[in-house]
């Protein structure tokens, strides 16, 4: 199990309930400016989730989610590789690679499977053209955000990994939101893991003549467990993403009547 630190527990449940995060309230009251120079830190953490200046927190959260996935694969007897992941030329012409290789899973006509993880925030926090969208839902249907991210990852990686020279790979996007919603492809992977774990369990107990009902019951238990384990890992990751490092802050926000072409819409050129 992934350990909860007291401040992470507090941060996650404040975000779940939609109330200000205690560690961010003082920064918001002081008007502390993010290192991006475009926004002040809000007490709900929406900008921190959205701004690329907080990549340290984002990377820690990303690794936490991968840790949870690797633990589930281990329980199912699936070996994984997190280093030296093959790279491909993405659809946008840039070189990229997935996050984790699942070895010898034999899916979609390929021996190995590569997954790429993403954790979407459902609220705006980095809008400049219309700042009223910050703190509001990014889409009326949150599932659209998951679908858009998954489609982007599939377009970038699936064909490249399937048609590369040498060893080819299947590809699955593993996308979920900070509220805990999971994209269908992520659930598909968790079902595959639950199925493999069930097969392994009956093999370990030496039961080669189990009924279909017994198999489905055990698989249902493991599927529930995999979803709960990923939900727990995601909760810890969400709390980690809302953390503010000292180097990501600037000076307190200046009085509204002061002129600062970098920070305030009133002085930003119309084409910004």
Segments the model singles out, each with a brief description of its role:
Residues 1-32, 37, 57, 71, ...:
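Non-catalytic C-terminal interaction segments of nucleic acid-processing enzymes
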Residues 34-65:
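Short Cys/His-based metal-binding microdomains
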Residues 45-51, 99, 115, 173:
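Short, conserved catalytic/metal-binding micro-motifs enriched in Asp/Glu and His
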Residues 63-77:
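Inter-domain linker/hinge segments that demarcate the starts of reverse transcriptase
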Residues 77-84:
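Short secondary-structure junctions
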């Amino acid at each position: 199990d992934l350990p909860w630190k007291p401040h992470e527990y507090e941060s996650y449940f404040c975000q779940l309930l939609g109330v200000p995060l205690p560690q961010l309230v003082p920064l918001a009251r002081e008007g502390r400016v993010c290192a991006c120079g475009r926004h002040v830190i809000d007490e709900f953490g929406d900008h921190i989730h959205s701004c690329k200046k907080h990549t340290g927190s984002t990377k820690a959260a990303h690794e936490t989610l991968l840790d949870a996935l690797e633990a589930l694969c281990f329980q199912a007897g699936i070996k994984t590789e997190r280093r030296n992941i093959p790279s491909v030329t993405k659809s946008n012409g840039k070189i990229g690679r997935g996050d984790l290789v699942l070895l010898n899973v034999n899916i979609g006509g390929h021996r190995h499977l590569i997954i790429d993880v993403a954790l979407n925030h459902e609220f705006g926090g980095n809008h400049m053209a219309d700042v009223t969208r910050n703190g509001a839902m990014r889409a009326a249907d949150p599932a659209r955000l998951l679908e858009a991210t998954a489609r982007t990852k599939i377009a970038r990686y699936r064909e490249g990994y399937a048609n590369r020279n040498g060893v080819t790979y299947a590809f699955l996007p593993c996308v979920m939101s900070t509220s805990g919603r999971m994209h269908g492809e992520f659930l598909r992977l968790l079902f595959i893991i639950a199925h493999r774990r069930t097969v392994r369990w009956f093999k370990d107990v030496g039961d080669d003549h189990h009924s279909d009902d017994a198999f489905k019951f055990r698989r249902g238990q493991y599927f529930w467990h995999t979803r709960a384990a990923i939900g727990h890992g995601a909760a810890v990751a969400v709390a980690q993403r809302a953390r503010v490092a000292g180097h990501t802050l600037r000076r307190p926000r200046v009085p509204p009547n002061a002129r600062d072409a970098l920070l305030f819409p009133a002085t930003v050129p119309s084409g910004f």
